[in-house]
């Protein structure tokens, strides 16, 4: 079953001896608000969160992992981040995206000591397929290149903001983010504030 695969992923990480483990807890299809497989949530909590260096849920996923349900504010995000941190992940970044504000993109990072709000301008949203996966991959890459978890998360936010801003239309239904935009077109500034 899928829970067995989740458990095996956690085991493989430990067996690998890798320094960092970034978990992107994909639970829903884009545009949906129902968990694909509810048993997977508990498996992620049990087998992945205690082993992860960084976990990168969106608002819906953070609500599921924390058990708090729908998150609608920075305060809700802080509560969820604390609960997820308490489950064993030392670095929690909750991606708020456009859900809290139509003009700004707010994410919340928690390292067990301080909450940080990461803010960028909101860019076009029509062509943003792959943004969440790209964020987790960019965080992983920045960690592998020697950045601290906080530095990696901030750099990944900038990378993805540029990728979203420069996303492109693939067809009438979807368009991906532009993974090369940060290096080729522009680097987006991320405002970091303690909250």
Please place each PLM-identified region on the residue numbering:
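Charged C-terminal helix
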Residues: 150-195
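Glycine/small-residue-rich loop that forms an oxyanion/phosphate-binding "nest" at active or ligand-binding sites
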Residues: 1-47, 57
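Glycine-rich beta-alpha junction loops
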Residues: 1, 27-29, 61, 97-100, ...
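Structural signal for hydrophobic packing residues in well-ordered secondary-structure cores
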Residues: 13, 17, 52, 88, ...
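Short, charged, surface-exposed loops that flank catalytic or proteolytic processing sites
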Residues: 70-77, 144-154
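Conserved phosphate/ATP/ADP-binding segment of small-molecule kinases
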Residues: 38-115
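Short, small-residue alpha-helix embedded
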Residues: 64, 125-149
């Amino acid at each position: 079953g899928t829970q067995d695969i989740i458990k095996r992923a956690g085991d493989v990480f430990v067996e690998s001896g890798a320094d960092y483990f970034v978990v992107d807890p994909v639970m829903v299809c884009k545009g949906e608000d129902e968990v694909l497989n509810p048993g997977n949530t508990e498996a992620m909590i049990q087998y992945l969160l205690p082993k992860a260096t960084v976990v990168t849920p969106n608002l819906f996923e953070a609500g599921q992992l924390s058990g708090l349900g729908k998150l609608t504010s920075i305060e809700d995000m802080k509560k969820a981040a604390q609960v997820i941190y308490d489950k064993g992940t030392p670095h929690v970044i909750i991606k708020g995206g456009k859900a809290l504000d139509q003009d700004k993109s707010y994410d919340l990072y928690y390292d067990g000591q301080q909450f940080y709000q990461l803010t960028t301008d909101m860019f076009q949203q029509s062509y943003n397929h792959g943004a969440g996966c790209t964020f987790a991959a960019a965080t992983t890459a920045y960690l592998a290149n020697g950045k601290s978890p906080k530095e990696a998360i901030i750099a990944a936010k900038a990378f993805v903001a540029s990728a979203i801003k420069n996303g492109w239309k693939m067809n009438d239904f979807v368009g991906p983010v532009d993974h090369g935009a940060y290096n080729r077109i522009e680097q987006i500034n991320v405002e970091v504030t303690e909250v």
